[in-house]
């Protein structure tokens, strides 16, 4: 359990950080590079930030929407001449745990994929514990609805009395098809964090030829083919859509504290997720 008591972490009234240090290592999904990653407590109002230990000067990359550069099959941040990729699962876990301030030390260009979900991150955070800080967490109100479209795909944020995430997908694979899910913050740790990333067997060779999924394997991603799942069992019957919702929450975490709203997405992508986050950030100006 998370050590700090009181309100649900996502709606806590004060900022939070880690009670200690947590460490992981693993391969990057796209780079295939082995990387070590350490979470360190950070002072109030620091925010979430990456530090590239392997680069001269150890440049800092804020986990903020302003730092987003690329969203091709993952979210990449760039700042101070450095980059870090595939940040969404870790950021989702930090947001689920209610961690506002943390220094993320990393020895390479991509966050390890681990098992393809946010569960290993969340379990490590829970082992260390989370502590409240004296600084208040800002209450962020969505002023008006925001919707971003791209063909049939869309993502929306609608003012609401409580935070809720709803996601829909539709793939021409019998094993997936059309799926919808909807969760509140208190359900994310158990119902969404364990959902793993997924891909399609027919695309593997092409993506690898493009320099992508170099670290992908049947141990860190679900793979779907025309005849069904290559590496069952699934953790949930609708695991793919739950993972897409996890990606959305990780991308919205780039706002720091996302506004209380009902977020609805259909056939969306990291590009649409981050476009929504940018539009919400503009409301704050």
From Swiss-Prot:
GO biological process assignments: lipid A biosynthetic process
A single GO cellular-component term on record: membrane
Active site (UniProt): 270
Enzyme Commission number(s) from the entry: 3.5.1.108
Keywords: Hydrolase, Lipid A biosynthesis, Lipid biosynthesis, Lipid metabolism, Metal-binding, Zinc
Any one GO molecular-function label of the UniProt entry: UDP-3-O-acyl-N-acetylglucosamine deacetylase activity
Cofactor(s) it depends on: Zn(2+)
Functional pathway: Glycolipid biosynthesis; lipid IV(A) biosynthesis; lipid IV(A) from (3R)-3-hydroxytetradecanoyl-[acyl-carrier-protein] and UDP-N-acetyl-alpha-D-glucosamine: step 2/6
Catalytic activity: a UDP-3-O-[(3R)-3-hydroxyacyl]-N-acetyl-alpha-D-glucosamine + H2O = a UDP-3-O-[(3R)-3-hydroxyacyl]-alpha-D-glucosamine + acetate
Residue sites binding Zn(2+) per the record: 89, 243, 247
Stored SUPFAM superfamilies: Ribosomal protein S5 domain 2-like
Family from the record: Belongs to the LpxC family.
Function of the protein: Catalyzes the hydrolysis of UDP-3-O-myristoyl-N-acetylglucosamine to form UDP-3-O-myristoylglucosamine and acetate, the committed step in lipid A biosynthesis.
Protein name in UniProt: UDP-3-O-acyl-N-acetylglucosamine deacetylase
Species per Swiss-Prot/TrEMBL record: Thermosynechococcus vestitus (strain NIES-2133 / IAM M-273 / BP-1)
Lineage: Bacteria, Bacillati, Cyanobacteriota, Cyanophyceae, Acaryochloridales
Gene name of this polypeptide: lpxC
């Amino acid at each position: 359990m998370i050590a700090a008591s009181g309100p649900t972490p996502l709606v806590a009234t004060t900022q939070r950080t880690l009670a200690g240090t947590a460490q992981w290592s693993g391969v990057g999904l796209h780079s295939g590079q082995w990387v070590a990653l350490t979470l360190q407590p950070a002072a109030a109002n620091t925010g979430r930030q990456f530090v590239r230990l392997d680069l001269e000067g150890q440049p800092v990359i804020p986990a903020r929407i302003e730092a987003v550069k690329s969203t091709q099959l993952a979210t990449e941040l760039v700042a101070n001449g450095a980059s870090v990729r595939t940040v969404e699962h870790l950021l989702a876990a930090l947001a689920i745990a209610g961690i506002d301030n943390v220094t993320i030390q990393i020895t390479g260009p991509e966050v390890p994929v681990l098992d393809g979900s946010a569960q290993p991150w969340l379990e490590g955070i829970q082992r260390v514990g989370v502590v409240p800080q004296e600084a208040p967490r800002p209450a962020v109100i969505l002023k008006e609805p925001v919707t971003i479209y791209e063909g049939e795909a869309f993502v929306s944020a609608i003012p609401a009395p409580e935070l809720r995430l709803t996601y829909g997908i539709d793939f021409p694979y019998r094993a997936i098809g059309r799926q919808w899910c909807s969760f509140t913050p208190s359900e994310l740790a158990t119902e969404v964090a364990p959902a793993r990333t997924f891909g399609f067997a027919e695309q593997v060779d092409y993506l690898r030829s493009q320099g992508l999924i170099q670290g992908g394997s049947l141990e860190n991603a679900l793979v779907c083919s025309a005849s069904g799942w290559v590496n069952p069992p699934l953790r949930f019957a609708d695991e793919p859509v739950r993972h897409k919702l996890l990606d959305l929450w990780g991308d919205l975490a780039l706002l720091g504290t996302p506004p209380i709203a009902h977020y609805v997405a259909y056939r969306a992508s990291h590009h649409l997720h981050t476009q929504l986050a940018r539009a919400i950030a503009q409301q704050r100006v």
